[in-house]
Amino acid sequence: MLEVDCTMLTPEVVLRTSGHVARFADWMCKDKASGEIFRADHLVEQVLEDRLKSDKEARGQVIGPDDPTSNKKKLKIKKKAPIKLDDEKVALYDRYLAQVGAHPCLVTDMQIDNLSGDELARIIKDEDIRNPQTGGVLEPPVPFNLMFETQIGPSGDKQGYLRPETAQGQFLNFQKLLDFNNSRMPFASASIGKSFRNEISPRSGLLRVREFLMAEIEHFVDPRNKKHDRFKEVEGQVCAFLPRGVQDAGSTQTLKDTIGHAVETKMVDNETLGYFLARIWMFLEKIGCDMSKVRFRQHMRNEMAHYASDCWDAELLTSYVSPPVSTFLCRLQ
């Protein structure tokens, strides 16, 4: 594996070519009266979860400290008397939050994350979602690019960005890395460094900040042959998978399967991707993670990076939220 240390400043042409300028964005909505800004999917998730919690209280159900719908990362909302929802509304909110059939430890907000701007606007309108603190009416969601823009040089005519991830530097140096490896494939490179994202509403402690340290490994393979010569060593490893087909059905019930069978049935795209999924599962187990609270979640088609053919997150449930601790991308060739 080759180590590479790349610049944090990236010329605009690089990120325009990679698609980041056009697509690296979240949906943002604004309070018409106060001008307060919200990330639309997080706001919708927050309001629906609070309404479900209020419904449980109205029905006399106890909300324990470990209840997955309990709100630990949200904006402050004025305490109101519990309001009971009709059963159809509860079922609708559960589908939006992908809680149907879920393991109680593995509730997530995947459905909300997958919604388009028009879909978020429809929910905000239909469910009368407003500013939680003031009750102000919200404008329709608009895309907000998450990259920090800057001008390079004294004349300011060269546009650039602070890198949103460390991968682009490795791609730009691919030819040099290949030459250093005597033009042999496959090979890998690794980079550790600061990345920057202009988050709409940074919250969740250190999990969503505008400047953070990240580590990325790029394993370069021949696109005509994505087999891995050590795949046999891990093909019997059993992992918990949440494939996109299950998510499409509105469920978060994980499937236990071996890496070998997952690759054979094409749930996982290829052997190389499967090999590294197995290795990270074994690594998390070795460092002491409770594996009943770990899963691999496959990105939905409209959720995947525009350059990916398959993508899985290793998600680890913590006492705070369920963040992805690692992401595996099989990039288009």
Question: What label would you give each PLM region?
Answer:
Residues 1-333:
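TRNA-recognition modules of translation machinery and tRNA-sensing kinases, especially anticodon-binding
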